[in-house]
Every structure is written in C-alpha cells, then in structure tokens.
C-alpha cells in the first residue's frame, strides 16, 4: 500500500469514528433529554397539572407508541383536560397491559358516555387489582354501586317529549324560564335578599307572594332548604325543612307546584348519579311531615349536574337545567311536555335507549 492510499484509508476511518462519536453523543443527549422530559412530565402529572404535562407525554407516545405507561399518562391527561373521546384509545392500550389506573379512567369514561355495562366491568377490574395489592377498595365499591344504579335507571328511561333546548351562561339560566303568574316566580337568592355576594341558590315564591322556599348555606358550608312566610308585610317564621329532605350534602333549587304540597329540588346526596340530581317529595298535611323523597329517572338525571325542575301546569310545559355535554360556565335548559302518568321507553334498542337517556338529540 502506498503512502497516499494509506492516508486516504486512515482519513476514512477517522471520519467514521467521528460520525459514530457524534451519533452516540446525540443518542446519549436524546436519552438524557427524554429522561428529563419524562421526569418533569411525571412531576406535573402528580401535581395534577395535566394540561402542562400533556405535550410531553404526547411526544413520548409518538416515539414509543407501545409503551403502556406513556399511553396511560397521556390518556389520563387527555381525560382530565376534557378530551375524553381521544383519551379512550390510549387508555385501552394501557389496559391491555394491565396498567391499574387505566381501568379506573376507562370506568369513568364509559360512565360519562352512558356505557354503564362496560363501566361496571372496568371498575370491577380496577377493584380486583386494588384487592390483589391489599389497597383500599371501599371508595371504588361505592362508585361501582353508583354505576349499577345508573344502569338500572337507564333500563327504566322515561319516554319524555323534549321539545326544545337553550344553551345559556350558568349564572343566567333563570332567564330561560317563562312562568305564568299562577305558577309563582323564581329569583336568584342574592337578588331576592338584596345581597352583594353572588350565591348559587334560588328562591321560589308562590302566587300569593306570601311564602318562599329557598336554599341557603349553613355554618357547615352546605346548602339546605328553608321556608319563610310573610307576616305583616315582613318575611319571618324561618324554618329549615326536615332531614328527610335536607342532608349532610347540598340541597338546592326548590320549586313548589300549584298544589302547595309537591316540591321539586336538587341534591348532591341520596345516591345521586353525579353532582346534583333531581328529587321530588310531597308534604303530608295530616301528619305535618314530608314523604321520603323520590329520585327522578333518566333523562332528567344524568352523571352531570341536573337541577331546577319547574312545571307550569297552566302552560303544560316543564323546564330543567343540566350541564351535561356543556363547556365550563355553560348549561342547557331543556323544555319538555310534562306527563302525569310516567311512561317507560319501550324498546330493546340499547343505542336508542342510551340516546334518549342522555338526550343526545332533540327530534
């Protein structure tokens, strides 16, 4: 080999070594940056800062689509930031590899979308995994009972004729209620009592304008239902409704039918499906007591907040409010035709029943 060829060969080897060195360095740097990115994302995730953690997990999933942990973290971030439909794909990848938290979030996701049978399966799997690790299962057993209750309720979905809906700002929902005088009137608590502080509660006043029902916060910081009567042009005789109605949770948004004894209200306790649910009770004049409240069925109640049931008998119209499928700060006011004789939706079509229970559309 002549000197020239030797130098060329040596130069090529040096070049290859340099390339290998650079590639190795870049791979090492990439690995370090990935580790730093993962650590930072996990820190944000554990702090509940899902929106901030989401971009990092998205990149990690793109690089390693089969990684079960990345899929679970990214799926949870999507769920917690409102992208529930998109989250399902990633949570299912994690669940296939038995990632514990994936089952919990799939249970929640299926519950939110009225797939209660599947939600029951996911929560049962989650409970079984917790039990194997000797972790507390009680909160999730209670959640499972809530899912089973929702499934039973969907099976008994009422055939309700909903004729219109209106999306409004949450604080302005009462503007959608158009009651005739004989049905009484509704006001915000802060407006009726002329308070500067806004309050998420309402006041119902009867047609005679001599009796009110309203919700007010107690020293324990939950809403309870009260009533007052007008005495000599002044409101007085304040009474809290009995504990058959009020509870350790929140009771709010009362409305009294023109018979003066039937009361609709919303509660966050008593086995609700999620948030506020609608209930009805009746005052027994002979015993001076209220009957055990009855939870309304679907489509009136949902996994979201449902409240302010009002029926104007003279108009033969009813209203109720729900934040189901609505962005933060918005609610939907549904207008329906009341039916004194409750009728079940008679169909074996599960998708139709799910659609009518959730009010996916109004036809």
Predicted regions and their residues:
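Short helix-capping/linker turns of helical repeat alpha-solenoids
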Residues: 66, 98-99
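Short, conserved micro-motifs composed of acidic
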Residues: 80, 101, 105, 112, ...
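Alpha-helical segment of the N-proximal tetratricopeptide repeat
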Residues: 36-66, 73
């Amino acid at each position: 080999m002549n000197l020239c060829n030797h130098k060329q060969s040596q130069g090529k080897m040096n070049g290859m070594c340099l390339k290998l060195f650079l590639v190795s360095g870049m791979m090492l740097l990439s690995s370090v940056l990935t580790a730093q990115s993962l650590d930072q994302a996990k820190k944000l995730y554990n702090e509940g800062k899902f929106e901030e953690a989401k971009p990092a997990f998205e990149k990690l999933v793109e690089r390693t689509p089969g990684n079960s942990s990345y899929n679970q973290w990214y799926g949870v971030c999507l769920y917690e930031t409102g992208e529930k439909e998109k989250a399902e794909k990633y949570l299912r990848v994690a669940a296939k590899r038995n990632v514990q938290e994936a089952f919990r979030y799939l249970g929640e996701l299926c519950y939110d979308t009225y797939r209660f049978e599947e939600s029951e399966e996911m929560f049962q799997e989650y409970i079984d995994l917790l039990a194997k690790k000797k972790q507390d299962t009680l909160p999730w057993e209670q959640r499972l009972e809530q899912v089973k209750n929702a499934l039973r309720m969907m099976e008994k979905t009422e055939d309700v004729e909903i004729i219109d809906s209106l999306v409004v700002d949450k604080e302005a929902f009462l503007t959608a209620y158009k009651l005739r005088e004989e049905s009484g009137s509704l006001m915000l608590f802060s407006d009726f009592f002329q308070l500067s502080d806004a309050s998420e509660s309402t006041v119902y006043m009867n047609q005679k304008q001599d009796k009110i029902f309203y919700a007010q916060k107690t020293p324990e910081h939950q809403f309870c239902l009260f009533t007052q009567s007008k005495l000599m042009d002044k409101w007085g005789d304040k009474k809290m409704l009995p504990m058959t109605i009020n509870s350790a949770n929140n009771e709010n948004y009362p409305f009294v039918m023109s018979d003066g004894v039937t009361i609709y209200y919303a509660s966050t306790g008593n086995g609700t499906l999620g948030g506020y649910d609608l209930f009805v009770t009746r005052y027994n004049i002979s015993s001076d007591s209220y009957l055990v409240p009855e939870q309304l069925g679907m489509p009136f109640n949902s996994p979201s907040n449902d409240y302010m049931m009002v029926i104007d008998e003279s108009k033969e119209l009813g209203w109720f409010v729900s934040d189901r499928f609505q962005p933060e700060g918005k609610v939907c006011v549904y207008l329906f035709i009341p039916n004194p004789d409750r009728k079940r939706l008679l169909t074996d079509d599960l998708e139709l029943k799910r659609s009518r229970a959730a009010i996916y559309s109004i036809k």
